[in-house]
């Protein structure tokens, strides 16, 4: 089993990069952030307060989260892959991920899903918490304005009307929450390779991460 951990803040491009790197290496791809977004979505729809740890943990435990072969996320039989990709659900994910019980439950599930498979797993605490012994650790980052522009472009591509100033404000608040939470905060693992991607194209970032993986674990 080889784990390639791709961590970084919102808008750093880790989802797209990790998915393409996994395809290039022939590895499985797993988006851990989607799981927290799904729990946030289900809690919001159920009217559960996002800081009510006991209720959110119970909801997460019964959610039946699973990925299909195309990487789409289901809660039971419902495909929630598109519904979770909003600024609101990003903020909800940040709040529920700070709850120790929720994080503990989902980290356990992420390790179970990985099994003994070669996998590219992306999130905010893969290299520091989920798989601290990962063979490859990469931390992607970029300037806040660049990350906000990327996130706004993603939302517009879905047909959403967005104000880039509001996207930037939400991004900075997400950074604050994720980096200051008591449990598994967002930070670069000491042995991770950091890539500042502000001036890089997507193809360049994918090639760089795939190259790092190949050098560290072989072709």
Give, region by region, the residue ranges found by the protein language model.
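Small-molecule kinase domains that catalyze NTP-dependent phosphoryl transfer to phosphate-bearing small molecules
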Residues: 110-116, 124-129, 133, 158-208
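Hydrophobic anchor at the beta1->P-loop junction of P-loop NTPases
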Residues: 4-6
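Hydrophobic positions on the alpha1 helix immediately C-terminal to the Walker A/P-loop
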Residues: 17
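Conserved lysine of the Walker
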Residues: 14
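P-loop (Walker A) phosphate-binding loop of NTP-binding proteins
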Residues: 9
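Glycine-rich phosphate-binding loops of nucleotide-dependent enzymes
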Residues: 137-146, 151-154, 194, 201, ...
């Amino acid at each position: 089993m080889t784990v390639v951990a791709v961590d970084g803040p919102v808008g750093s491009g880790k989802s797209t990069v990790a998915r393409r790197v996994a395809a290039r290496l022939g590895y499985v791809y797993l988006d851990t952030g989607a799981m927290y977004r799904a729990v946030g979505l289900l809690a919001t729809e159920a009217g559960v307060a996002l800081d009510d740890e006991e209720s959110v943990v119970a909801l997460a435990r019964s959610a039946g989260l699973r990925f299909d072969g195309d990487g789409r996320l289901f809660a039971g039989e419902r495909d929630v892959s598109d519904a979770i990709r909003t600024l609101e659900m990003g903020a909800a994910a940040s709040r529920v991920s700070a709850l120790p019980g929720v994080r503990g439950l989902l980290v356990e599930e992420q390790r179970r899903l990985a099994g003994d498979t070669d996998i590219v797993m992306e999130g905010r605490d893969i290299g520091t918490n989920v798989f601290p012994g990962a063979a490859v650790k990469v931390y992607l980052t970029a300037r806040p304005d660049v990350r906000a522009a990327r996130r706004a472009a993603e939302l517009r591509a879905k047909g959403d009307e967005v104000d880039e100033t509001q996207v930037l404000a939400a991004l900075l608040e997400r950074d604050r929450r994720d980096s200051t939470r008591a449990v598994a905060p967002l930070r670069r693992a000491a042995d991770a390779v950091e890539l500042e991607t502000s001036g890089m194209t997507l193809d360049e970032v994918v090639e760089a991460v795939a190259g790092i993986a190949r050098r560290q674990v072989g072709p």
